[in-house]
């Protein structure tokens, strides 16, 4: 059975950058965001239920889910957010567990932004946190997504605090620095962790 390394971090922490460095080394990954998009793909049963609940205005002209419109809707309505989570989370969890079970590599990177919040830590053998300051989170997220600060702050408030996330960490990569200057350091850190995780996987399956 594949050894599972859970990769998590708050909004704007650079999880994708770190995940890509692992995939450059040939490590397979199961990405919660990808799975979340798959379960609400065009013409899927779950998307039909979402449209039934929220109306067709949460669809794009192509009939796909308009994630920004849906995010705006649920962030302002706690009951709608609860309904949506109750619909999606079980389906996403099952799909992720299925994908993890299919992996045959020594270890698999399990990329989940809300790993701790959604109580998915039990699926992991080890947890790697990409850590940045709240100030970096705000600046990066605003620059990347064109989101306003208020919406980013709401997203940050819905996630566990930096301190709480670090309590769960077995390993930490600090990603506060600008990527251009920090890339060699990140590559070295990821390579070291890669060797370590291969050893851990070997020990587990011995």
Curated annotation (Swiss-Prot):
Keywords: ATP-binding, Coenzyme A biosynthesis, Cytoplasm, Kinase, Nucleotide-binding, Transferase. It catalyses: 3'-dephospho-CoA + ATP = ADP + CoA + H(+). It holds the Pfam family CoaE. InterPro entries: Depp_CoAkinase, P-loop_NTPase. It is an enzyme of class 2 (transferase). Disulfide bonds: none annotated. It comes from the Bacteria. One of its GO terms (molecular function) is ATP binding. Pathway: Cofactor biosynthesis; coenzyme A biosynthesis; CoA from (R)-pantothenate: step 5/5. Residues 4-204 form the DPCK domain. One of its GO terms (biological process) is coenzyme A biosynthetic process. Its main location: cytoplasm. HAMAP family: Dephospho_CoA_kinase. NCBIfam families: dephospho-CoA kinase. Belongs to the CoaE family. Catalyzes the phosphorylation of the 3'-hydroxyl group of dephosphocoenzyme A to form coenzyme A. This is Dephospho-CoA kinase.
